Amino acid sequence: MALMIFSMVFMFILLFKPLVFSMMNKKCLNSTYTSTVKWAFITSMIPLMMYMNSSKEIIILNWHWLTVHTIELKMSFKLDLYSITFMPVALYVTWSIMEYSTWYMKHDPHLKRFLNYLSLFLITMLILVTANNMFQLFIGWEGVGIMSFLLIGWWYGRTDANTAALQAIIYNRVGDIGLVIAMAWFYKNSNSWELQQIFSLGTTSNLPLIGLILAAMGKSAQFGLHPWLPSAMEGPTPVSALLHSSTMVVAGVFLLIRFHPLMSNNSMIMTTILCIGAMTTLFTAICALTQNDIKKIIAFSTSSQLGLMMVTLGINQPYLSFLHICTHAFFKAMLFMCAGSIIHNLNDEQDIRKMGGISKTMPLTASAMTIGNLALMGTPFMSGFYSKDLIIESMNTSNINSWALITTLIATSLTAAYSTRLIYFVLSNSPRCNSVINMNESDNKLTSPIKRLMLGSIFAGFLLSNFIQPVNMQNMTMPFTIKITAMLVTIMGVIVAMELNLMTQYMKMYPNNYNFNFSIMLGFFPTIIHRSVSKSFLNFNQKIATSLMDYMWLEKIVPNAVVMMNNAASATTSTHKGMLKIYFMSFILSMVMLMLIMS
C-alpha cells in the first residue's frame, strides 16, 4: 500500500514539474514534457501491477481542506479498478500526443504554453478520475472544461475557433447545471460528498440522477447537447486527439460509471440512459456518413462510440463501458494523429474528396489509419473487438428495449460503412491532390507516437479484457447467430459502403440534391439552435423595443397626444364660422321672443 501511495504522489510530482519550471522562467526543453509524461506512465504501472496481483482498492486521505457547517472537505484519492486502469491508458496516449505535438506545432511561437495546457488538461482529468469526493471531482470536471475552452480556441485570431470554443463551454455549462443540482441534493440528504457515504444511501430520488445524466450529456456530447463536438475540430489536431481519446468527452461517461451503484436498480434511469445512448450512436453515425471533412468524420465516430458506451451503461454493464473507453482511446488518438499528418502534408487540406493514394506516398500513416479504422469497426482481434463484441453480445442476451437494440446494430453497421468510406477516399485510388506537394513522414516525432498507438490499437484490448470482467455473468452458451451478430452487421456495413463507393464512379450526381441535407446539415440542429431560435428571440425583442415601446412613446404618447389636443382645441375654437348676420338675427329673435314671453 505504501508503494502504491508513493508511486501516485511521485506521478503527480512528475506531471507538475514542467509546469513549475515554466512558471519560474527556467529553460524547459520541449522534450522535457514528453519524457515527464513517459516516466509518469511508467510510474503509474506500479499501482496497476499491484492491483492485478492483489485486487485491493485503497483510499488515500491526505489533507483536510476546510469544514463548512457539518461537512468536512478532504483531499482524498480513490484507487480502484477504474482509476488504476485509466491512469496508464491516459498517460500512454498523452505521451504519444505530446511527442506528436512537438512535430505538428513546431512552428508555433507559443509551443511551450501549448504543452503546458496539454499537461494541465491531463492533470485535471486524472484529478477527476481519482477523486473520492464530489468537490474534488467538480474541480477536475471544471478544469477539464476550461482547458478544453483554451485549447479549442488556441488559434484565437480565427473567428471559427473562438466560436467553437464558446460553443464547447456553453454546452458544458448546461451540463454543469445538472452536476451542481446533484451535488446540492447529496449535500442536503447525505450531509457529505464522500462517495462511500453517498453510496450508503442506497435508494435515492430521481432528481440527482437526472442531474448526473444531464452532466454526462453535456460533457460527452450526447443527443441534444452534441453540436459542440464537431465544432471543436477548429482546434489543433493534437487537441482533437487528446480531447476525443482519454480526457474530456469520456469524462461524462466516466461520471455515470462512478455513480452506477446508485442507478443500477432504477429502471427509469437506466432506460433513459439506454435511449439517449441509442439515439446518439445512430444519429451521429448517420451524420458521419455524408461528411467530407476528415476530422469531422472521426469526430462523429467518437460521438457514436460515446453513445455506445451510454447504451452499455443502460444495460447495467459499467465494466464493459469502461473497457470500451480504454480500448477506444488508443485507436481514436491514432486516427486523429494520422489525419493531422495527412492534413499537414497536404498543406492544410481536410476534404477527403481531394485526397487519395496516400498509401503510396505515406505508407506508415496509411497502415496506421487502416488499423485504426479496423479497430473502430470491431474487427476480430483488434482492440476494439474485445469491447465492442462483448457489448453486442450483452445486448443480445439481456432484457433490452428492442428499439434500442435495433438502433445500436444499425449504428454498428454504419460505423463500418463510414470507416470503409474513409479508407476508400483517403488511402486508395490515385492521388487527387496538387502534384507539387512534397509529402514525407521521416520525422521520428511523427512516426514514433503513431507506432506506439498502433501497438495499443492491436494488443490493448486483449490485455485489458483479461482483468476487466463484466459485472453480470454472461450466458455461457448462446445461439451461433447471436454470437456472430456484431461481425455480421459489420460485414454488411463494409459491403454496402464498397458497393456505394463503386456506384458513385458511374452515377451522375445532381448538384441540387436535397436527399442528404439532413445528414450534411447535422440534423439541422446547429441551424435551429444557433440560428432560428436566436433569430426569433432577436426579432421578438426588436418588435417589443421598436414596435411597442418606441411606437407607444414616440408616436402615441408624446407627439400624437399633442396633435390630438391641438385638434380638439382647434375643433372647439373653429365652431364659430364668422356669419355675423345670422348670429345677429338669431340674437334679435331670441331677445324679441324673451320680451314677448316676459310681457
Swiss-Prot record:
<feature type="transmembrane region" description="Helical">
    <location>
        <begin position="478"/>
        <end position="498"/>
    </location>
</feature>
<feature type="transmembrane region" description="Helical">
    <location>
        <begin position="362"/>
        <end position="382"/>
    </location>
</feature>
<dbReference type="Pfam" id="PF00662">
    <property type="entry name" value="Proton_antipo_N"/>
</dbReference>
<feature type="transmembrane region" description="Helical">
    <location>
        <begin position="137"/>
        <end position="157"/>
    </location>
</feature>
<keyword id="KW-1133">Transmembrane helix</keyword>
<dbReference type="GO" id="GO:0008137">
    <property type="term" value="F:NADH dehydrogenase (ubiquinone) activity"/>
</dbReference>
<feature type="transmembrane region" description="Helical">
    <location>
        <begin position="453"/>
        <end position="473"/>
    </location>
</feature>
<feature type="transmembrane region" description="Helical">
    <location>
        <begin position="79"/>
        <end position="99"/>
    </location>
</feature>
<feature type="transmembrane region" description="Helical">
    <location>
        <begin position="297"/>
        <end position="317"/>
    </location>
</feature>
<keyword id="KW-0999">Mitochondrion inner membrane</keyword>
<feature type="transmembrane region" description="Helical">
    <location>
        <begin position="237"/>
        <end position="257"/>
    </location>
</feature>
<dbReference type="InterPro" id="IPR003945">
    <property type="entry name" value="NU5C-like"/>
</dbReference>
<dbReference type="GO" id="GO:0005743">
    <property type="term" value="C:mitochondrial inner membrane"/>
</dbReference>
<keyword id="KW-1278">Translocase</keyword>
<keyword id="KW-0813">Transport</keyword>
<comment type="similarity">
    <text>Belongs to the complex I subunit 5 family.</text>
</comment>
<keyword id="KW-0679">Respiratory chain</keyword>
<keyword id="KW-0249">Electron transport</keyword>
<feature type="transmembrane region" description="Helical">
    <location>
        <begin position="198"/>
        <end position="218"/>
    </location>
</feature>
<dbReference type="InterPro" id="IPR010934">
    <property type="entry name" value="NADH_DH_su5_C"/>
</dbReference>
<keyword id="KW-0496">Mitochondrion</keyword>
<dbReference type="GO" id="GO:0015990">
    <property type="term" value="P:electron transport coupled proton transport"/>
</dbReference>
<feature type="transmembrane region" description="Helical">
    <location>
        <begin position="41"/>
        <end position="61"/>
    </location>
</feature>
<keyword id="KW-0812">Transmembrane</keyword>
<dbReference type="InterPro" id="IPR001750">
    <property type="entry name" value="ND/Mrp_TM"/>
</dbReference>
<feature type="transmembrane region" description="Helical">
    <location>
        <begin position="509"/>
        <end position="529"/>
    </location>
</feature>
<comment type="function">
    <text>Core subunit of the mitochondrial membrane respiratory chain NADH dehydrogenase (Complex I) that is believed to belong to the minimal assembly required for catalysis. Complex I functions in the transfer of electrons from NADH to the respiratory chain. The immediate electron acceptor for the enzyme is believed to be ubiquinone.</text>
</comment>
<feature type="transmembrane region" description="Helical">
    <location>
        <begin position="269"/>
        <end position="289"/>
    </location>
</feature>
<keyword id="KW-0830">Ubiquinone</keyword>
<feature type="transmembrane region" description="Helical">
    <location>
        <begin position="578"/>
        <end position="598"/>
    </location>
</feature>
<dbReference type="GO" id="GO:0042773">
    <property type="term" value="P:ATP synthesis coupled electron transport"/>
</dbReference>
<protein>
    <recommendedName>
        <fullName>NADH-ubiquinone oxidoreductase chain 5</fullName>
        <ecNumber>7.1.1.2</ecNumber>
    </recommendedName>
</protein>
<feature type="transmembrane region" description="Helical">
    <location>
        <begin position="323"/>
        <end position="343"/>
    </location>
</feature>
<keyword id="KW-0520">NAD</keyword>
<dbReference type="InterPro" id="IPR018393">
    <property type="entry name" value="NADHpl_OxRdtase_5_subgr"/>
</dbReference>
<dbReference type="InterPro" id="IPR001516">
    <property type="entry name" value="Proton_antipo_N"/>
</dbReference>
<feature type="transmembrane region" description="Helical">
    <location>
        <begin position="400"/>
        <end position="420"/>
    </location>
</feature>
<feature type="transmembrane region" description="Helical">
    <location>
        <begin position="166"/>
        <end position="186"/>
    </location>
</feature>
<feature type="transmembrane region" description="Helical">
    <location>
        <begin position="1"/>
        <end position="21"/>
    </location>
</feature>
<feature type="transmembrane region" description="Helical">
    <location>
        <begin position="114"/>
        <end position="134"/>
    </location>
</feature>
<dbReference type="Pfam" id="PF00361">
    <property type="entry name" value="Proton_antipo_M"/>
</dbReference>
<keyword id="KW-0472">Membrane</keyword>
